[in-house]
């Protein structure tokens, strides 16, 4: 078993019309034993940028704390929030810096850039970025997430339809992966509001 599969995870981000959604499962396990059913994988960096971290839970929390620290330093120095592209480059640089003893995480970054244009990307544990215009996935359920997202995604969805699509994709995918699941956590972000919703799925 890969160390990336030790705790289990599923994270997905999807682009809509001037909005994006990012979702994750809520299970924290140690291989097949469930430890917690309300684990937070998605974090808000500021109102227009979110990050979801799949992988080893200890490294997820350590990396998140470092990212918050670096973003606050940037805010103090520049007196503004980071753009999503800048934040993605920061995450990539932090991961690459530790490439010989890497953080065992695979981040998914989603944000709204200039002119409310949505930006999503994912990267591997040493910071190699993968940009996309439709959706990105990571975690132990990524194979089934790819299939579900390919089947359900369509461009320029409004916020409510995007929520429905990402939720169905997440819930149907975690049912096919025994290391992730126990409901879902979804954020839908538009230029004017942030909606947070908890999904109830199969509780086994």
Curated annotation (Swiss-Prot):
Gene3D superfamilies hit by this protein: Glutamine Phosphoribosylpyrophosphate, subunit 1, domain 1
Keyword Cytoplasm set for record: yes
Superkingdom of source: Eukaryota
InterPro entries (UniProt xref): Ntn_hydrolases_N, Proteasome_beta_3, Proteasome_bsu_CS, Proteasome_sua/b, Proteasome_suB-type
Swiss-Prot/TrEMBL keywords: Cytoplasm, Nucleus, Proteasome
Keyword Protein transport included in the entry's annotation: no
UniProt record, GO biological process: proteasome-mediated ubiquitin-dependent protein catabolic process
Recorded GO CC terms: nucleus; plant-type vacuole; proteasome complex; proteasome core complex, beta-subunit complex; secretory vesicle
Transmembrane segment boundaries: none
Annotated compartments: Cytoplasm; Nucleus
PANTHER family, per database record: METALLOPROTEASE TLDD (PTHR32194), PROTEASOME SUBUNIT BETA TYPE-3 (PTHR32194:SF10)
Subunit comment: Component of the 20S core complex of the 26S proteasome. The 26S proteasome is composed of a core protease (CP), known as the 20S proteasome, capped at one or both ends by the 19S regulatory particle (RP/PA700). The 20S proteasome core is composed of 28 subunits that are arranged in four stacked rings, resulting in a barrel-shaped structure. The two end rings are each formed by seven alpha subunits, and the two central rings are each formed by seven beta subunits. The catalytic chamber with the active sites is on the inside of the barrel.
Family: Belongs to the peptidase T1B family.
Reported function: Non-catalytic component of the proteasome, a multicatalytic proteinase complex which is characterized by its ability to cleave peptides with Arg, Phe, Tyr, Leu, and Glu adjacent to the leaving group at neutral or slightly basic pH. The proteasome has an ATP-dependent proteolytic activity.
Designated name of the protein: Proteasome subunit beta type-3-A
Organism: Arabidopsis thaliana
Encoding gene per record: PBC1
């Amino acid at each position: 078993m890969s160390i990336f599969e030790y705790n289990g995870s599923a994270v997905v981000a999807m682009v809509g019309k001037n909005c994006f959604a990012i979702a994750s499962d809520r299970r924290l396990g140690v291989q097949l034993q469930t430890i917690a059913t309300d684990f937070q994988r998605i974090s808000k960096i500021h109102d227009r940028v979110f990050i979801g971290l799949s992988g080893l839970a200890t490294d997820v929390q350590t990396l998140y704390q470092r990212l918050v620290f670096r973003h606050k330093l940037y805010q103090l120095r520049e007196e503004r929030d980071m753009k999503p592209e800048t934040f993605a480059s920061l995450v990539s640089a932090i991961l690459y810096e530790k490439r010989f003893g890497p953080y065992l995480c695979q981040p998914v970054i989603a944000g709204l850039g200039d002119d409310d244009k949505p930006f999503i990307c994912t990267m591997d544990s040493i910071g190699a970025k993968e940009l996309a215009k439709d959706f990105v996935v990571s975690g132990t359920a990524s194979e089934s997430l790819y299939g579900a997202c390919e089947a359900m995604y369509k461009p320029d969805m409004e916020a409510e339809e995007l929520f429905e699509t990402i939720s169905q994709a997440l819930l149907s995918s975690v049912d096919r992966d025994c290391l992730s699941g126990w409901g879902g956590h979804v954020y839908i972000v538009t230029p004017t509001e942030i909606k947070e919703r908890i999904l109830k799925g199969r509780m086994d």
